[in-house]
Amino acid sequence: MTTINCDMGEAFGLYRMGDDETLMPLISVANVACGFHASDFNHMRKTVRLAKQHHVKVGAHPSLPDLQGFGRREMKMSRDELANCIIYQVGALKGFLEAEDVALNHIKPHGSLYGMAARSDAVAHAICDAADVFKTPLMGMIGTQHEIVYRARGHAFIAEYYADLDYDDDGSLIITREHKAVDPAEVASRCLRAIAEGKTRSIHSRDVPVRADSICVHSDTPNAVEVARAVRDALTSRRQ
């Protein structure tokens, strides 16, 4: 059954990002920010509690150490540095999960770290080095180093499809610094096609292969609530 995942807990101190309270009942999996691109100790625990309240599974959403750039700027780090960076973040979230008696469901890298791992086997291996510590599945995209390296290293692989981002002609994701509003009905239609046909349209209207074990909706998309509701309703109708 295809799930809906959403990046959550991305507020920081007095700064707000996303409508987590409204989004949480609409999703099945929350990727919780771990402090390096967004969030802090108070928001992490608050988000874990909110997910528990709505019976939403929780995964870690670690980032490059780029709080000012929201984790959407690339950095050069050694494999050991990167693995330690991820272990540090996931370990922090795991402490809050244990405090609330909630299991760690998966790890999904954030932003530029996600994009780098899709292209670079060295970065993907660093992520696996961290995942080895926590013995948890990894979320990523088919046809990339995510799938190749994660599977080769023996990690369960959750293939995701992005509801609110564009794909390039080679099937890679176009990661932008800021997200724009999208048409909920069009997004829902794209998601259903991704599930049924394993295809989506690129920015130049070419079909590229995808797989949608889980569908991602970003909480910082301006109309994220409407998008999540449209995707949820489409999936519910498909199952009936």
Where are these regions (language model features)?
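Flexible, glycine/charged-enriched surface loops at secondary-structure junctions
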Residues: 97-105, 198-209, 240
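Catalytic beta/alpha-barrel core
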Residues: 32-37, 116-119, 134-143
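Acidic (Asp/Glu)-rich catalytic clusters
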Residues: 21-25, 46-59, 98-99
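Active-site rim beta-loop-alpha module in soluble metabolic enzymes
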Residues: 143-199
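Glycine/small-residue-rich loop that forms an oxyanion/phosphate-binding "nest" at active or ligand-binding sites
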Residues: 66-101, 106
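Conserved, mostly hydrophobic/aromatic
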Residues: 7, 61, 107, 217
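C-terminal helical cap(s) of enzyme catalytic domains, especially alpha/beta-barrels
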Residues: 51, 193, 224-240
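A short alpha/beta connector and helix-capping loop motif
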Residues: 12-45
